[in-house]
Amino acid sequence: MPSIRLADLAEQLDAELHGDGDIVITGVASMQSATTGHITFMVNPKYREHLGLCQASAVVMTQDDLPFAKSAALVVKNPYLTYARMAQILDTTPQPAQNIAPSAVIDATATLGSNVSVGANAVIESGVQLGDNVVIGAGCFVGKNSKIGAGSRLWANVTIYHDIQIGENCLIQSSTVIGADGFGYANDRGNWVKIPQLGRVIIGDRVEIGACTTIDRGALDDTVIGNGVIIDNQCQIAHNVVIGDNTAVAGGVIMAGSLKIGRYCMIGGASVINGHMEICDKVTVTGMGMVMRPITEPGVYSSGIPLQPNKVWRKTAALVMNIDDMSKRLKAIERTVNQQD
């Protein structure tokens, strides 16, 4: 279990210490579950009333909240960001693998940097290049001539097809597949003729990809994921998609082929985005958005009907289904009124 003096933690977090710096911090916890040795954080003033009941040894908070502190405190401008950084310092997550497992199959032509770990039953094919401190979890497959940059980690059962490039300090969760064939077919009088997918997937640095996500290889050009992109679980990213730096994609999103998304975008969960078009920088699509046309202006975009009581929704749906008839009737009434005038 990691531990650190509160004063040392404050220094690493560039926080202002109030209280005993010799307190030993052993973990991060919520305000409700924290006990002695824990540090917690408060991001909303409405939780001030809970400080009196909180058992944490220290609390991260803003200057405005400091008068309400009942324990040692670290004062910062952004408690949530500080929480993320202190959680990294006190992280107890094990590595996906340690050392080279005896059952790992590593081709003689593969190149491994220093301090590489490969888990049980993983397969590393010919021509693969693994940078320093790369960790390959149990049961992973890394296809021919693929490259994985220094410090990147693959959890168990990740599949990386041939000729894929993954940058430095990336994290890929279990059962994700990178570089499978895109959905490319030509129609010959009702019969589907497969188009070999000859492109690659290029993933930048500091990219994180959730579990059970699929990113298809390009048909001719490459599928490209920019630096700092974060992608949640169970997303489908089709061939030739390009995602700009630092864009966030929530769970269950489906992106059709040849879509280009700009930088600093946020795509809400279960959204569906049409292909062969562009979305500009700094666009937010709220959950379950259906994006059928290009977006050329930054901003927040929504579609769909929010949840309603069933009876209300049925009435709304009935009105929508009859909107064409209502429009025709309204136009007829307008013509009659105009004639009377």
Curated annotation (Swiss-Prot):
It catalyses: a UDP-3-O-[(3R)-3-hydroxyacyl]-alpha-D-glucosamine + a (3R)-hydroxyacyl-[ACP] = a UDP-2-N,3-O-bis[(3R)-3-hydroxyacyl]-alpha-D-glucosamine + holo-[ACP] + H(+); UDP-3-O-[(3R)-3-hydroxytetradecanoyl]-alpha-D-glucosamine + (3R)-hydroxytetradecanoyl-[ACP] = UDP-2-N,3-O-bis[(3R)-3-hydroxytetradecanoyl]-alpha-D-glucosamine + holo-[ACP] + H(+). Coiled coil: none annotated. Keywords: Acyltransferase, Lipid A biosynthesis, Lipid biosynthesis, Lipid metabolism, Repeat, Transferase. Gene3D superfamilies: 1.20.5.170, Hexapeptide repeat proteins, MurE/MurF, N-terminal domain. The keyword GTP-binding does not apply. It comes from the Bacteria. Its EC number is 2.3.1.191. Pfam families: Hexapep, LpxD. GO terms for cellular component: membrane. The active site is at H239. One of its GO terms (molecular function) is N-acyltransferase activity. It is an enzyme of class 2 (transferase). Belongs to the transferase hexapeptide repeat family. LpxD subfamily. NCBIfam families: lipid_A_lpxD, PRK00892.1. HAMAP family: LpxD (MF_00523). This is UDP-3-O-(3-hydroxymyristoyl)glucosamine N-acyltransferase. The lineage of its organism: Bacteria, Pseudomonadati, Pseudomonadota, Gammaproteobacteria, Enterobacterales.
